[in-house]
């Protein structure tokens, strides 16, 4: 899980999701997991 100021989709499978006020990127590739912090 990378914690970044600006999250973005890295590949076509990445999905932007909003949970509890945080923006997350989830993907089948675990390297693409990100959270805005």
From Swiss-Prot:
| Keywords in alphabetical order | Plastid, Ribonucleoprotein, Ribosomal protein
Q: What GO biological process term is on the record, naming one?
A: translation
Principal localization? plastid
- State the source organism's domain of life: Eukaryota
Which InterPro entries does the annotation name? Answer: Ribosomal_bL36, Ribosomal_bL36_sp
GO CC aspect terms = plastid; ribonucleoprotein complex; ribosome
Subcellular localization is given as:
Plastid
Single GO MF descriptor: structural constituent of ribosome
| Pfam families for this protein | Ribosomal_L36 (PF00444)
Return the similarity comment. Belongs to the bacterial ribosomal protein bL36 family.
Q: Which NCBIfam families match?
A: rpmJ_bact
Give the protein name, as stated in the record: Large ribosomal subunit protein bL36c
**What organism is the protein native to?**
Cuscuta exaltata
Q: What is the lineage of its organism?
A: Eukaryota, Viridiplantae, Streptophyta, Embryophyta, Tracheophyta
